[in-house]
Structures are given as structure tokens and as C-alpha cells.
Amino acid sequence: MQDHKITLFHANWSFCSQMVRVALFELNIKFDERHIKLCDQYAEGENLDKNFLDINPLATVPVIKINNEVIVNSTTIIEELNKRFQSNLCIEEDDSVKSFVKQTTITEGDKFASTIGTIIPVFSAPLIEFMIRKLPLKSIIKIIMKHPRKDRKMIFLSMYFFGVAKKFPNLAIKKFADELIKFEKLLNEDNTYFYNEFSHIDINMMCVFNRLEDLKLSEVITTNKTPLLQRYWKNLQKRDSYKKGILNYYTSKEHKVIKDFYNDAPSPFLKPILVELAKRN
């Protein structure tokens, strides 16, 4: 019986929010939720409001409250949920497992586009810029005045005024091809998931693959270079948590943004990635 009050502060389309929601559904944890309209997607910019900054002064999601305790960072949240609810979701987390978990999420302080997890935001940057440039000026002023992080403030302002993100993905194409091949070689054809049992790494990779779908890049895991990745993704899509924690949180807004941005065309970065993959052994 669950005797903790769990409240999740999250955003529908947030990469790391998706990870935590999947974990909550995998662990069968009941939770209240509060959707935060992020400043890079919505005019309201609720993550910059005082009531949210009082909860997380960094203005990021996801945040979870367990009773009155606040926990931030998706990896930390999932690890804490795993410990407190006596699950084996993360398996025995030795150093190698922790390293893989770190590589498959957005980790503060990691080198730019250095892992598969930190490459995803680079590929997402043009889409984020598309949303930011549709915001009213008053929302940009709110970012200038209230965003607590100078780095994010400068990125958002550069996107809004100068459209700097259009070519960001070019910086990560070769490394991304390397990362895909690396993960292909790490997979075991006898396992259903990364290991045989579903784990924290699988949560992160589920979100990585789903974001590739959003970015019109999913074809990169359907080549003859990545047969195990393709099978792995199909297995992840069969989990109930994929629908409950990710697909069910898409609204007409997210679908419209994708449609308007790509205009039913493939990603301009798809072919360069496929070319790089073809070069790999």
C-alpha cells in the first residue's frame, strides 16, 4: 500500500519528464501531476513564476515531491523512486550500469553533444527555436528578467533574435553515428531489452527513440547497421508505460508544432546521418 503523497511537476513534451513518467507507471506508483507550461514552448512561461521557482530555483522540470521532500533531476528521481518503492527497476547499479544511465540522459556538466543523451537536445534545437520564435515579445522579456540560469537565458535569446539553432545538429552528426553503432554492439540478441529485464537504461532509451520519431529521424535505427537497435525499439514500444507515460501526453499542440515545422518533409539531417552510418563498421 502506498502511504506517500507523490506530486510530479512536469511538461508534456519534456524529454526528462517523459523518463520520470515512464518510471512512475513502470513502478505502478500513484501520483498527482501538475503540468508546467515551459518558457520555451508557451507564452505563460510558468516555470519562471515565483510559485514554481520556490520549488525548483533552477526553473527546470521534472520535479517530484514525495510528501514534502523535493527531488530534481530525472536520474536522481528514478533512483529514489526505485529505492523507496523496493523495485528492481535499476537492477544492481554497478559503475558500468551507472555509466550507461548517465550516457542516455541529459546530464548537467557533460561535454556538448558527447553522449547519445546530450546529442538529443542538439538535434531538438531547431524545433525548440521554431517554438521560441513564435512567442510574443513579452514572453521573451519575462525570460530576460526572470530566468535564473544565464546559459539558458542566452541560448533562448540567441534563438529568438538570431535564429542560431538551424545548423546545430551538423555539429553532432558524426558523434551520433558513432553512438548508435556503439549501442548496437552493446546489445545482446538474446535479451529483450538492454539487459534481459527492463531497467533504468531502457526508460532512457525509450525516450531517446521516441524523440527521434518526433524529429523525423527514426529511420536511422532501421538500417542494416542497426538490426538489434530496431528490434530493441520495437520491444520498448510494447511496454504499457510507453503509451501511458509518453504517447498519452501528446496533445494537438505538439502534433501541430511537428507538422508545421517539418511540413510533411523528412528531416534535413536524416540523409547526412545515414551517410555517416554507412561508413561505420
Kindly give the residue locations of the regions a language model identified.
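GST-like fold's C-terminal all-alpha helical module
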Residues: G109-K234
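Long, positively charged, glycine-interspersed low-complexity recognition regions
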Residues: L215-N281
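GST-like domain detector, emphasizing the conserved glutathione-binding G-site
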Residues: M1-H147, P272-N281
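Conserved G/P- and acidic residue-centered "switch" motifs that form tight phosphate/ATP-binding loops
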Residues: S14, D202, R239
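Active-site-flanking alpha-helical
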Residues: N82, V208-F209, I246
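Short alpha-helical hairpin
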Residues: I29-K30, H35, F52, P148-M159, ...
